[in-house]
Amino acid sequence: MFHIALYEPEIAPNTGNIIRLIANNGCQLHLIEPLGFDLEDKKLRRAGLDYADLANVSHHKNFESFLKAMQGKRIMACTTKGSRPHSELTFQQDDVLLFGPESRGLPADIIDSIPTEQRLRIPMMSTSRSLNLSNAVAIISYEAWRQLDYSGT
């Protein structure tokens, strides 16, 4: 299956929703520290309901340790600054979908380190800034899973 990575997530309920999501689609979640909340946060647990035991979650102390763990995998920067719509990419089994923090998105240096053709965006109205993080993760991860014929079901 593929991987979902959250770079310095800030809002516990969003991460909780994503934990519930990955329990349902079989992805592995990577949380890249620092986190903007405590993992024991009530809002995180409430949003994730009882899915935490079904979810595969890894923690990384920083971006460098995350990159080391993902060595050899294709990383997609999921950003409003993406060069192409997410639906134009042909996803592969071990791809990594990397999302930035809610208030600021991925830093420019991280975006710049990823090949242009691997910088994905979700099409939206020109008057909008962004989508909610957990919604964006759902949209892109389910498109990737669809392309992989819902493997694992």
Swiss-Prot record:
Family according to the record: Belongs to the class IV-like SAM-binding methyltransferase superfamily. RNA methyltransferase TrmH family. TrmL subfamily.
A GO cellular-component term linked to this record: cytoplasm
Example GO BP: wobble position cytosine ribose methylation
Source organism superkingdom: Bacteria
Reported function: Methylates the ribose at the nucleotide 34 wobble position in the two leucyl isoacceptors tRNA(Leu)(CmAA) and tRNA(Leu)(cmnm5UmAA). Catalyzes the methyl transfer from S-adenosyl-L-methionine to the 2'-OH of the wobble nucleotide.
HAMAP family: tRNA_methyltr_TrmL
Reactions it catalyzes: cytidine(34) in tRNA + S-adenosyl-L-methionine = 2'-O-methylcytidine(34) in tRNA + S-adenosyl-L-homocysteine + H(+); 5-carboxymethylaminomethyluridine(34) in tRNA(Leu) + S-adenosyl-L-methionine = 5-carboxymethylaminomethyl-2'-O-methyluridine(34) in tRNA(Leu) + S-adenosyl-L-homocysteine + H(+)
Family annotation (InterPro entries): Alpha/beta_knot_MTases, SpoU_MeTrfase, TrmL, tRNA_m1G_MTases_N
Pfam family, one: SpoU_methylase
Binding sites annotated in the UniProt record for S-adenosyl-L-methionine: G100, I122, S130
This protein's name: tRNA (cytidine(34)-2'-O)-methyltransferase
Subunit structure and binding partners: Homodimer.
UniProt keyword Signal, yes or no: no
Keywords: Cytoplasm, Methyltransferase, S-adenosyl-L-methionine, Transferase, tRNA processing
EC numbers: 2.1.1.207
Any one Gene Ontology molecular-function term assigned to this protein's record: RNA binding
Subcellular localization(s) per the UniProt record: Cytoplasm
